[in-house]
A protein has these predicted regions:
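Membrane-embedded transmembrane-helix bundle of lipid-linked glycan/lipid transferases
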Residues: 2-411, 522-526, 530-556
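Alpha-helical scaffolds flanking conserved acidic
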Residues: 133, 326, 446-449, 512
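Active-site-proximal, structured, solvent-exposed surfaces of multi-pass membrane proteins
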Residues: 449-555
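Intrinsically disordered, low-complexity regions
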Residues: 9, 14, 41, 322, ...
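Membrane-interface segments at or immediately adjacent to transmembrane helices
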Residues: 408-470
Length: 556
């Protein structure tokens, strides 16, 4: 591994990366101060999730149910949405108002992307090469598109782990723990990006094994390398069992397939294709972005070839073998998968359709571009101090272009239900289609602030507690009562301390028969076997990874 800068002297300090990262973040904060926060498509969803999670965590309850969604009827959002992004958002929400919490989230995610790419490329590249690669990766057009226009905060945070996974896979001596940890972090941050990362792992593993076979490596060595990739994948997935197992078991209890309706499937979002359900603006922006990426990659690879041909004598390569070929093949594959002829691949590869939008593959193309830039800058001699200034300037130029293209004007806050006067107290009312409980219908769903009964009450209904929900009814006679809460298999509903039979409703709300007396109804969340087994598997896997790391360190 190359641990020298362009001048050839060892550099052990952190001055250059710290200065470059600080300059890039200050530039981003300056744009936020100048423009205000951006109204991304999913901003209300995330602000509502963060606010609900922060409230529950302050009460000592691990979030499972988003009570404010679906006009107060609720949905099991936190069962299915990976926890790392909303846990970070909840922390930021307790420290700042909603708009500023979103700004800090974007800055922290950008810093994570910067640090991850710097670390991944610095293992073999010079300091200037790693600085430029990190700045381009963190402020690339697709990153700004995701953060400013889409407010896809989970996807943005998950981009932090992709360079770590890729670096572990292309390492000359990959380890199980180095593969397992970033893979697990991907699955705990964002499902579409985790699927991308899993296929990236599979692609690089096959590429590496094929290269070893072509070089006639011993069969035992090839088998050992395959075992490392397989073991890292298995342990990475098992490490997420506390989240992934309950989500898989409970998938039948919600309407996940509705996420792919109304133009949200891969067939409606290929490049160079427009359907009645496709957003023309998004298609135009993504196509332009793709053209810019392809042009930049071509220029970088041509420049690398020219520089290498002009060398007076062969120079030993410090980067992993066949990296340029791997990046070229990966870029071509990504480009193909964004075009309509690749529909058969999307249809038959397991879970690839969960990505919904083929242009999400631009996150991989961003990774390829950053690595290609590192390869290019690694071929030339640049002073680290000059590289710091160049990296900050590159970040500023990319952010300026991104702000002009993707920033959503805060003047449109009222249109999106985010007026400054009530943004701190706002709640997410609209239901999320894919998290709607099975059998429930969102059509005609209205706000219900309190329970309703078929007979009059002699006194107002009392709320005895919120977690668990306990209500006391004062009824004049036997009545059918409806709670402002949707039914879900994990709810245990008790009336007078006994399990209460429920009456089906079209909107899915809990409805039950109560006697003519003071009746206490309790609704409690029940932990299932999947939660217990999931936590046990995650803890056992964490212990296994610790033992792997200790064994590896002892032998080293």
């Amino acid at each position: 591994m190359n641990k020298e800068d362009a001048s050839g002297s060892p550099r052990k300090g952190l001055l250059e990366p710290a200065t470059a990262l600080t300059g890039s973040l200050l530039t981003m904060l300056l744009f936020f101060l100048s423009y205000g926060y951006s109204i991304g498509d999913d901003l209300p969803f995330h602000l509502g999730s963060w606010q609900a999670a922060a409230l529950l965590l302050r009460q000592g309850v691990y979030p499972q149910w988003e009570a404010a969604a679906a006009y107060g009827a609720g949905e099991p959002r936190f069962v299915f949405y990976p926890p790392l992004s909303w846990l970070l958002g909840a922390l930021l929400r307790t420290l700042a108002t909603p708009p500023h919490a979103a700004e800090w989230f974007i800055c922290l995610a950008a810093a994570g992307c910067w640090l991850a790419m710097y670390w991944a490329t610095r293992r073999w590249a010079t300091v200037p090469a790693a600085l430029l690669a990190a700045s381009i990766y963190a402020a690339a057009p697709y990153m700004l598109f995701s953060s400013l226009q889409r407010a896809a905060f989970g996807e943005l945070l998950a981009a932090t782990w992709l360079p770590l996974l890729f670096a572990a896979c292309i390492s000359p001596a990959p380890s199980v723990a180095a593969i397992a940890m970033p893979l697990a972090l991907l699955w705990l941050t964002n499902a579409p990006t985790a699927i991308l990362g899993s296929y990236l792992l599979l692609f690089v593993a096959l590429f590496q094994l094929l290269k070893m076979l072509l070089r006639q490596a011993p069969a035992c060595v090839v088998a050992l390398r395959a075992g490392v990739f397989a073991g890292g994948t298995a342990l990475g997935l098992l490490l997420t069992s506390f989240f992934l197992l309950p989500a898989l078991v409970q998938a039948k209890d919600v309407q996940l397939d509705t996420a792919f309706e109304h133009g949200q499937g891969f067939r409606d979002n290929f490049l160079i294709r427009h359907t009645a359900l496709t957003s023309r603006q998004t298609l135009h922006e993504v196509t332009a972005m793709m053209a810019a990426y392809v042009f930049a990659l071509l220029c970088v690879f041509v420049a690398i070839g020219v520089l290498r041909r002009r060398r007076p004598r062969p120079v030993a390569e410090t980067y992993p073998g066949s990296l340029r070929l791997l990046l070229s093949v990966l870029a071509c594959l990504v480009f193909f998968l964004m075009l309509p002829p690749s529909a058969f691949v999307w249809q038959h590869l397991p879970k690839l359709a969960v990505l919904q939008f083929p242009w999400r593959l631009l996150s991989l193309l961003t990774l390829v571009l950053a690595y290609a830039v590192a390869l290019l800058v690694n071929e030339v001699r640049i002073r680290p101090s000059h590289a710091v200034l160049v990296s900050i300037a590159v970040s500023a130029m990319l952010m300026s272009a991104g702000a002009a293209t993707y920033w959503r004007d805060p003047q449109q806050m009222e249109q999106h239900g985010l007026r400054p006067a009530d943004v701190a107290a706002r709640i997410q009312l609209r239901p999320t289609q894919e998290y709607t409980p099975a059998g429930a219908n969102n059509t005609g769903l209205q706000q219900m602030d309190s329970p309703s009964c078929s007979v009059a009450s002699v006194a107002p209904t009392e709320t005895l507690s919120v977690h668990p929900l306990q209500l006391r009814f004062h009824l004049q006679g036997p009545a059918t009562c409806t709670l402002p809460l949707r039914n879900y298999p994990r709810w245990t509903v008790l009336a007078q301390g006994r399990a209460a039979p429920l009456i089906p409703r079209r909107d899915g709300r809990i409805m039950l028969q109560l006697p003519a007396a003071d009746a206490v109804v309790e609704v409690r969340w029940r932990r299932g076997w999947d939660n217990v087994v999931g936590v046990a598997l995650s803890l056992a896997t964490l212990l296994t990874l610790f033992l792997f790391a200790a064994h590896s360190r002892r032998h080293t």
